Amino acid sequence: MFSKFRSLIFKIDPETAHNLAIKSLRLNLTPNLKDENKDDPMFKTKLFGKEIDNPIGMAAGFDKNAEVYNSLFKLGFGFVEVGTVTPLKQYGNPKPRVFRLVEDEALINRLGFNNLGSESVSNRIRSNLNKGLLGINIGPNKDSDDRLNDYLIGLRTFHDIADYITINISSPNTENLRSFHDETKFDELMNLVKEEKIKLKSKIPIVVKISPDILDEQIEVLSKILLEHKVSAIIVSNTTAGNRGKLNNILKHQKGGLSGKPLEEEANKLISKFYRLLKNKIEIIGVGGVDSGESAHAKFLAGASYVQLYTGMVFQGPNIVGKIKKELKEILITDGIENFREIIGKKQPN
C-alpha cells in the first residue's frame, strides 16, 4: 500500500509530510495491518521489568508532542518514546529544517527540539492513558540559563507517568548540548538526577541517549560513570553531525543531524564498544539504520537488547515492524534460535 503512494509523498516537503502522517495517525486513517507474528514468543521480552511483545521501538523525534503514541502501538511497536520535550514551549530552528536524501535512505534534520513544552505534553499524556510501554525523552531549552535544572524539571514533570525517562545529551542541533559528554559535566548531571529521584521517591528507570560522534576515551569514561550511577539503559546512538563523505544526494552538506542507513555501520561499532565495557550490567537500545530483519539482527549481535527506528519508517512505511519481524524470524529459524535474546552480543570484533 505505502509503495503506491511513496513517490507522491516524497514530492512533499519532509516536515509537511511528517505533519500529515501525525494527523493521519491521530485520526486513525492508517490501514489495518496484518502481523502474523504479533504474539510470537520468538520476540517476547521485558523492558525495565515490563512484558513487551517485541524489542522494536519508535525512537524519539517522531511523536514529539505525545499526540499519537497509542496509534504507534497499533502499528506493532513494542515500545514508544516521545519527545524530545523541553520545560518551555520551543519553536526550534528556522525552516526548512528537514531534508530527505532518497538515494541514501537518510534524513538530515536541524529541528532544534521543537515541542509544546513539558506542561502541555504532560497534560496530554495524563488525559490519554498509554496502552503500551511509553518512554519520555527530555532535554533543555535552547536559551536556558540552567540546563541542568531543565533536566530536573523534566524528571519532576514526567516521573509518575512515564515507564522510563531518557536524558538527551546528544542532539547536534542544540548548541553545546553535547558538552554533557564531558566527564565532569556528565557526572554532575547524573548525580543531580539521582538526588532528584530520591526527593521524588521515584524508581523511574533512567536512560541516556549517546552521541555517535565520540572518541574511544570518551566511551570508556562514560561507561564508568554510567555503571557508577546504575543507569538503566543507554540509547546508541543519536544522529551524527558528520559521516557525509559517502552520501550521494545533493543535500548531503546541509547542516544538521544525519539519520538512517548511513549511520548503521558506525552505530553498530559503537554498540559493540559499549557492550564490552558495560558487561551486561546496563542494557543497550540500538538505533541507526534499522529498516529490515537483517539490520535489527546486526544490532542484536553487536550487543543491543532492543532497537529503535524512525527514518526506516519514512522510507518503508507503517508496516515496518511487521516486515522486520517477518524477516528476522526467517534468520533466527535458519540459525536454530528460539528467542532473539539468545544472540545478543554474540558477534564482537576481535
Predicted regions and their residues:
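Catalytic cores of alpha/beta
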Residues: 65-72, 152, 214-228, 276-280, ...
